[in-house]
Structures are given as structure tokens and as C-alpha cells.
């Protein structure tokens, strides 16, 4: 199952959170959902050079709060915050409510699946050999602390007549393990031979190790206490 299902969707509510966090009644739900789609589409189009990994949207009390995770915060903010203010006004027009923009810097962009997939796609569009592009990305990710990475490309690779799929993996990528922090993303390279799909899985480590150990330890202590009481009662 873990091999087929979306890695991020399978872990929602366990170790991952939603990208849109708000509540709405039946009347407003579809409008808010469509509004989130339009806001994300606009921001990703405007900030294509800012290396945006993900956009989190919250809706507190008739307003909207947008958090942009980017590897280049200076590109978004601009001189003295001029660019971000213009961006906030445009997002406010799209959403129709007061808007607050937060910028969060990504310290290690080499471990973000979205940025890695976009990087490979851009190299393929520049006619870089796909094996070379994949190895560059994999080596940089493993060097900066990734526990494992898997990259899959599919399409008319290197202009071949018949489309095929090739993948490369280094390290561990445990897709069946819920506590495994796996970042997944998909991108497309539009080449002269057609569209080439790029999928990236990045395993960053296990999140719930300490919590699970604590729970197991407490269970053992409860069993030990129960066995001690039982022995005393027999005596």
C-alpha cells in the first residue's frame, strides 16, 4: 500500500499537517477551497524564481494568513519590504479579506522534495543528461543529512522514440512506516520531445522515536507495578 498511495496524504494527522488549516460550513467550504487554489496558483506564478517549497494558508476570524516557505526570502521581501507589501495587496484582492503574509526561510533547500524535483525538471529542460541531473541532486541531498532519497523520471528520456521510466535510489526510503518523515513531490519538465515527469521522495528520519519509546516504557512500568502488587497479595 505504501508504494502506491501518496506519501504526504497517508501521513496527514500522524506526523504531517494540512497545507490549509481552517473550518467552514457547507455554504462557504467550496468558496474557501477555490480561493485557496487561486491564491496558491498566483503566488507560485509570481514567485517562480524564489524557490518556494510550500504555502500554508490559515483563516482566522474573517482574514487570511499565508505562510510562504522559501529558500530565497530576499527575493520575495525586496528592498525595504516593498515587494512583499505589493504582493500582500494582490493576495488580499484575490481572497477578498484582510491578508497577512509570513515568510519562512528554508535552511536546507537540498532536503526539500519540491525544490529538488523542480531543479531536476529545469536541468532536463536545459538538455542536461537525466542521469547526471539525478546524481547531482542525490549526492547533494545525502551530503546534507538525508537518510535516503529516491528519484523517478518517466517520458521520452534523452529523446528516445519509446517512453520509459527510470529511477535511482540511495539510502533508505521506508514508505510503509508511518513515523518516517518522507517528503514527496512531483514536477514536470516540458522538453522539445514532450513532457517528462519527475518524482522525488526524501527520507529525513523518524519523528516519533522518542514518543514511542516513552509509551513502551510506561507500559512496561505498569506491567511491573501490577506484577508486584500481585506478588504482595499472595504473600
From Swiss-Prot:
Keywords: Ribonucleoprotein, Ribosomal protein, RNA-binding, rRNA-binding. CDD domains: KH-II_30S_S3 (cd02412). The gene is rpsC. This is Small ribosomal subunit protein uS3. Signal peptide: none annotated. GO terms for cellular component: cytosolic small ribosomal subunit. Part of the 30S ribosomal subunit. Forms a tight complex with proteins S10 and S14. Binds the lower part of the 30S subunit head. Binds mRNA in the 70S ribosome, positioning it for translation. Belongs to the universal ribosomal protein uS3 family. One of its GO terms (molecular function) is structural constituent of ribosome. It comes from the Bacteria. GO terms for biological process: translation. Residues 39-107 form the KH type-2 domain. It comes from Blochmanniella floridana.
